[in-house]
């Protein structure tokens, strides 16, 4: 039997006014059956629709629902970080707002967590995303491998459960570029995954765009990994060796066969190739320098516009915990 512990469910909200009431209705019986106390933290990530109004209505109807509204759209992981820091219970569960992660699958994650793991992912038996979301998932996992390793990255998903103690590892993290999965690896190596059902999206449309996909994957690789720098170093080394071999070939041909040294077109192509490699490497270095610049500016990962009363009453406790 799984020992009961208090639960906090954190849900990033974006343009989901239609699905939120259904999500809460399905969460209530699951949480009531598996936790002595529980809460749901809905973080509105600058939704332009009526999502915040829906969140406010839900907090009035359910005493265990709390709401936070951010100043603008910061991104899913930034909103999650805000909600995770606001969570007050022993176990934190994160899931999307689109009902593709069935709340009824939460007990599977809790059961695996009870075996001694610190973080458990719900790995979909068969993903039911659209093309862009599937592509986003694949690219993100590839980028995540460079930061956390292939084993963890393979099972990473937005449906996860972890012990609140893990949060202590990134309680002082600051910066605009956030990856919850990388931050979790700062606190533990005890990861596991269980197979869960993954439903088709029936309400609304995916908010993933090609621009968001590229931005998140690039943030993953340059924000929490040195892989791009390593790749640039290897590419630079390979082209250096290539240039050296070309030089030997030209000199050898001139000395042994008496041939003429290739003219301007050949030399121009070699110079252009090496200049391109140098610019590529400088661009990557510049990206890292820019990120250092942003962190030195103390640019926050999110800013809160307003909170429901339940969150405001908990604020003194939260601040004390963050600065302990």
Q: Can you describe what each PLM-predicted range is?
A:
Residues 1-4, 179-324:
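Hydrophobic helical membrane-anchoring modules
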Residues 8, 37-39, 66, 118:
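Structural signature of beta-strand start/N-cap positions in the alpha/beta core
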Residues 92:
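Short aromatic/hydrophobic "clamp" motif used to bind/position activated sugar donors
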Residues 18-21, 49-58:
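Acidic helix N-cap motif at the loop->helix transition within catalytic regions
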Residues 36-47, 68-69:
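Short beta-strand/loop segment that forms part of the nucleotide-sugar
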Residues 57, 64-72, 76-86, 100-183, ...:
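Acceptor/aglycone-binding surface of glycosyltransferases and processive sugar-polymer synthases
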Residues 44-53, 99-100:
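A conserved acidic beta->alpha catalytic loop
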Residues 1-29, 35-36, 318:
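N-proximal low-complexity "stem/linker" segments adjacent to membrane-targeting elements
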């Amino acid at each position: 039997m799984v020992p009961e512990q208090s639960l906090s469910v954190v849900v990033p909200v974006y343009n989901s006014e239609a699905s939120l009431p259904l999500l809460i209705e399905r969460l209530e019986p699951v949480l009531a059956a598996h936790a002595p106390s529980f809460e749901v933290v809905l973080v509105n990530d600058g939704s332009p629709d009526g999502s915040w109004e829906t969140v406010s209505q839900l907090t009035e109807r359910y005493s265990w629902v709390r709401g936070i509204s951010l100043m603008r759209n910061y991104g899913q992981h930034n909103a999650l970080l805000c909600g995770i820091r606001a969570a007050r219970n022993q176990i934190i569960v994160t899931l999307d707002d689109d009902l593709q992660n069935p709340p009824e699958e939460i007990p599977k994650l809790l059961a695996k967590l009870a075996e001694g793991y610190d973080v458990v992912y719900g790995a979909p038996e068969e993903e039911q995303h659209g093309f862009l979301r599937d592509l986003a998932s694949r690219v993100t996992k590839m980028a995540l491998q460079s930061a956390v390793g292939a084993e963890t990255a393979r099972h990473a998903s937005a449906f996860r459960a972890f012990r609140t103690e893990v949060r202590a590892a990134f309680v002082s993290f600051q910066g605009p570029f956030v990856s919850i999965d990388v931050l979790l690896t700062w606190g533990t190596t005890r990861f596991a995954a269980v197979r869960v059902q993954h439903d088709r999206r029936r309400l609304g449309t995916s908010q993933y765009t090609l621009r968001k996909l590229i931005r998140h994957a690039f943030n993953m690789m340059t924000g929490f990994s040195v892989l791009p720098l390593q790749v640039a170093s290897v590419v630079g080394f390979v082209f250096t060796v290539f240039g050296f071999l070309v030089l030997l070939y030209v000199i050898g041909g001139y000395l042994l066969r008496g041939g003429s040294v290739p003219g301007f077109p050949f030399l121009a192509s070699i110079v252009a190739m090496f200049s391109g490699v140098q610019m590529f490497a400088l661009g990557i270095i510049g990206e890292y320098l820019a990120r250092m610049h942003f962190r030195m500016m103390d640019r926050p990962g999110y800013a809160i516009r307003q909170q429901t009363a339940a969150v405001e009453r908990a604020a003194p406790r939260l601040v004390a915990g963050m600065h302990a």
